[in-house]
């Protein structure tokens, strides 16, 4: 059995790198779409060639946000998912889910480079330290009776909101962009010196045609 899937991610301060799949006839290629400060829709990573392969030498759009600090704990983070298709790399209807992964990262400065920790993740438990302001009217708990919801979620057994998966209720057609999922993120934990907060948005996709084979 062959499952055609794709994964992509985006974070507050880094560019997205899509993981693409090269199976003709049922390709999956998804990307994170975000609103910038001018409320323009930006595909977080445009660095793919005509064949859909990621190419670091190509120009990339990296959406940079206001940095969370002791004095500013909330920042805008408006995200959606796009089914990226092209004539040379046609995709199929894709079912997607998203998870938020908050982390603290050591700054890329001289001191951290000297200590050989620049860019590394700070080992810190993020449970109870992050709040997400979800898009108005389109996100609902799976068991609710909300009929207008485009995204649904079910809390995990751990009770940690960072373990949630958000599922788009309809498959994205080639070229289609989902409704916005997230508006803002707030971090209420500690910020050690020479570190910064990042929210990594992980998106996974599977070809709609493969769903009947999942048990």
Q: What residue ranges belong to the model's regions?
A:
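Long, small/polar-residue-biased beta-strand-and-loop interaction regions
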Residues: 1-215
